[in-house]
Each structure stands twice: as C-alpha cells, then as structure tokens.
Amino acid sequence: MVKLVFKRVFFVIGIILSLPFIAATILESLLLGEKGEKVLSWCKEILSIVPTVIGEYMRLGYYWAVCKKISPDALFMFGSMVAHRHTTIGAGAVIGVFTIVGYADIGENVLTGAGVSLISGKYQHGKPEERAGGKEIGERYDRINVGRNSWIGQNAIIMANVGENCTIAAGSVVYKDVPANGTYMGNPARKVNIELGQIAKEN
C-alpha cells in the first residue's frame, strides 16, 4: 500500500514536471490534427534522455497525457520512446532502455529488453515489389499487438503480432504473427522447444 502511494505521488510529480511538453504536444494536435507530430517528436527525444527516476516518471506522465491509453503503472526506462499517439500500453509493462515503440498495443506485464524496436508493421516504406518494380511507393502503418505477459529480448525487432505469454529471444526478428504460449528465436523468428538445455526447431 505504501509503495503504491509513493508511486502515485511520483506519477503526479512526473506529470507536473512534464506539463510544458504536454501542453505543447496537445496544442500541436489541436492545431494540426493527426499530421502534427513534429512537436511530439521533439518532446519524446528530449524526455528520453532525462536520467534517473525523475526521467522515468516524466516520460510516464507525458505519454499518459498525450497517448491513447498508457497505464500509470507502466515504466519507461532511459532512452525509450513512443512514436505514435495512438499507442496503448498496459499495467506493469516495462519499456526497456533505448527501446522504440511504434503504432502498437502493448499488453499488461510485457517486458522488453534494451534496444528493442516495435515498429509499425512491415511496410512503412512501401512493399518490396513496389520498390523493385519502380512503382509509386505508398507508406503503410499497421498496428501491432504484443500480448500480456510476453518477454521480448534485447535488440529484437517486432514487425508483427506477438501472442500472450511468449518469449522472443534476443536479436530475433518477428516478421510474421506468432501464436501465444511459445518461445521464438532467429531471423526470421521461429518457434523452438527448449528442454534440458537443448534447442529443437518445431516444424
């Protein structure tokens, strides 16, 4: 109970300290609508490098105020950034050091290691066939979902949905949706069985 009270006090302090950033971002949104993300980019970059617990709560307060739905029980570590206002992050989620979250829904108790990239789908800069064929390249942003209780290892790249209770090994690239309750590793990420210290790929 005491710990929760302290967390809420720090949460409020974080909001107060980040008020200038919150006000500037909301004003940009009111004036420019969905296209207004320049101030958002500036603010998230500045706040990402504020150190110590002060920075953690300033980032939390800022994203709680300007994003679609951010739990006050989430944690944003040093260097972490959220790229889009419509991102949602559940209670107990930890956004690791230098992790970037794109257009995503992050479930409760999701843990990310350092340097994880949760990007907005596979086609942000067009499809390969468009580029190879010399066609006009159309940007496309897809919302990705990471299910609750999943753990994503250091430097993993997530371009598709991750089910609940999953483990994504460090350095893996999730290119296609992966079902719940599995361990995945590699580039592209594949499901593996880990028993007695041995790894066997599942077909």
Question: Which role fits each region the language model picked out?
Answer:
Residues 67-68, 86, 175:
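Alpha-helix termination/capping residues and helix-transition junctions
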Residues 160-185, 202-203:
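C-terminal/domain-terminus segments
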